[in-house]
C-alpha cells in the first residue's frame, strides 16, 4: 500500500514536534502481538488521548523476507534490524515462511553446483577445494582426450580400406612395370572399380624361382583383420581379367601400394646425420615389433626376418616428411608357433637383435642416449629373448621415456615404481598441449605423433616398469 506523501518541509533533526509533523506509526510497535502493518493516519496528540478511533481490522499475516547480499547471505530477524555501514548491494529476495526461516539457508556454498557452462568440468564446488579431486579429474580428462585423438588419427591413417573383391568388380592395369619389388614378389598397380567407387590396389606377383610359400601362413594372412603393420589382402585377380598383364594365373590383391623396401631405404637413409638415422631406425623397429606381437598373439612366428621383404608405404593423411609406414608382407615364411606360458622366450627376439645390430652398423657411431639404449636392447634381445610385446615397450621407453634417470642408481624398487604414475600423467598432458599447438597452426599430425599417442594411451605403471627393467636391470 502506498505511504502518505512526505511533508513539504523537513523537520529539524534535533527537536521533532508532534504538533507540526505528520507521524508514521506501525501497529506492530503499539501492539506486540501484531505483525508490521500499514502506517496510521495523521492525528494530533490531543485526539490520540481524548477520542481514539476504532482500530482497523487486522491485515493478512505477512511472511518474512530474506534478502541476499554479497558476499554472504543470512536471515534477518526483527531484533537485528539496524543500520550497519557500509551497505551491501541488494541482489534480490525470496520469501519463506516461519518454519523455513528457522531452518537456515537452503544449501551450503560447498554444495552448490555449476551451471550448464561448467558441466564439462565434472566437478562440484566442494571438489574445487580438494587438490586431489582436481588432479584426478584432470588426469582422467587428459587420458580420455588422448584416447580420442589416438582413435581419430588411427581412422585417418587406416581410412578408406577397400574391402574384399566381389564378382561385379572390374579391374584395369595402370602400369606395365612394377611399382615396387621385394625379395620374393613384384607389385603392379591395379584399379578396381564398381559403379562409381574405385580403389587403387596392387597385384602381388611371385617372382620366378622364389621359395614355395607356406600355405598356413597365406591362409593366416587372408583371414586377418586389418592391422596397421601387416599387409592385408583383398582377394584375387582371376586369370584373364587383365589382358596384357605380365604374369599368368590368378594373383593376390593387396590393399596398400608400397613405395620401396626397408633394404632400399637403408641405402639412402644411412647418409643422414647419425641422430636422425638412429631415430628413424627406432621408429621402424617399433612398427615391426607391433606386427610381430600380433603374430605371436595368434600363435604364429616368422621363420626368417629379411629387410627386403619389409615394405614401406606413405601413411595416409599425414605429413610427407614424417616416417613411413612399415608393412610385414612375408607371410609365406610364417609358421605355426603355439604361445608358451608367460615369461617364455620370444620366438622373434634373436632375429630382432641381429637386425638391430646390422642397422646400427650402417651409420656413423652416435653418442646419443637413444643410440646407447638401442645397443643395450640388441644385447638384451639375444641374452634374455623377451617377447615382441616387451620389446615394443622397451622401444617406446627409449623413444619417449621414461629414462634411467627416473630410477637412479641403487634406488629402491618401490619409490621408483610409484614415480611412474606422476610421470605418465605429466607426459600425457604435455603431449595433448603440443598436439593442440600444432593443430592451431594448421600443421598436420605425423605418424610419429600417432605412435606416441598409442604409447601414452595404453601405458601403465606396470608396463613401463617391465620395459625399464628389460633395459636397465
Swiss-Prot record:
GO MF entry, a single one: protein kinase activity
Compositionally biased region (Polar residues): 16-27
Result of altering residue 146 to E: Abolishes homodimerization and interaction with CRK isoform CRK-II
Superkingdom classification of source: Eukaryota
Effect of residue 453 to E: Abolishes homodimerization and interaction with CRK isoform CRK-II
Transmembrane segments: none
Gene Ontology annotations for the cellular component aspect, listed alphabetically: actin cytoskeleton; focal adhesion
Positions of region (Disordered): 1-27, 42-61
Reported effect, residue 436 to E: Abolishes homodimerization and interaction with CRK isoform CRK-II
InterPro entries reported in the protein's UniProt record: MitoQC_Scaffold_Kinases
Biological processes annotated in GO: regulation of actin cytoskeleton organization; regulation of cell motility; regulation of cell shape
Subunit text: Homodimerizes. Interacts with CRK isoform CRK-II; the interaction requires PEAK3 homodimerization.
Family according to the record: Belongs to the protein kinase superfamily.
Function according to Swiss-Prot or TrEMBL: Probable catalytically inactive kinase. Interacts with CRK-II and antagonizes CRK-II-signaling. Prevents the formation of CRK-II-dependent membrane ruffling and lamellipodia-like extensions.
Protein name per the record: Protein PEAK3
Species per Swiss-Prot/TrEMBL record: Homo sapiens (Human)
Lineage of origin: Eukaryota, Metazoa, Chordata, Craniata, Vertebrata
Protein encoded by which gene: PEAK3
